[in-house]
């Protein structure tokens, strides 16, 4: 692997947002409008404080304890974290239980698979 020459070490963070699936397009648009186009999107299941929901299915009540969610991951420089978080919150919030959660995680390095270039 070759390490790219850097003028300065840039602290990077991964912003991980677990959101309602129907809010994905709004979140993508909000991020793109602010210049953040790279992201990884995964369909996931989970639960938080709401602990699932009860639904009617073929006349019977069914408890669903893991709900469909969408996970959006964006890696940005440390100084862009607040802008990314604000974009996600403002575009994904409904004000109801189940809106999701955002996590900010340190990233130690990034390696481009095609070239082997490493950023620290």
UniProtKB/Swiss-Prot annotation:
Source organism phylogeny: Archaea, Methanobacteriati, Methanobacteriota, Archaeoglobi, Archaeoglobales
A single GO molecular function term of this UniProt record: enzyme regulator activity
Protein name as catalogued: Nitrogen regulatory protein GlnK3
Regulation: Activity is influenced by intracellular pools of the effector molecules ATP, ADP and 2-oxoglutarate. It senses the cellular nitrogen status through 2-oxoglutarate, and the energy level of the cell by binding both ATP and ADP with different affinities. ATP and 2-oxoglutarate prohibit binding to Amt3. ADP promotes the complex formation.
Binding site for ATP: 40, 48-50, 75, 98-101
Underlying gene: glnK3
Sites where the protein binds 2-oxoglutarate: 48-52, 69, 98
Transmembrane intervals: none
Membership in a protein family: Belongs to the P(II) protein family.
């Amino acid at each position: 692997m070759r390490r790219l020459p850097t003028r300065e070490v840039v602290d990077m963070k991964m912003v991980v947002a677990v959101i309602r699936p129907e809010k994905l397009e709004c979140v993508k648009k909000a991020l793109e409008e602010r210049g953040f186009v790279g992201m990884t999107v995964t369909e996931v299941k989970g639960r938080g404080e709401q602990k699932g929901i009860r639904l009617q299915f073929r006349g019977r009540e069914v408890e669903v304890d893991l709900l469909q969610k969408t996970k959006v991951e964006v890696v940005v420089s440390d100084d862009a974290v607040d802008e990314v978080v604000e974009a996600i919150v403002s575009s994904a919030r409904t004000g109801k239980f189940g809106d999701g959660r955002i996590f900010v995680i340190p990233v130690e390095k990034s390696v481009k698979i095609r070239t082997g270039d490493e950023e620290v």
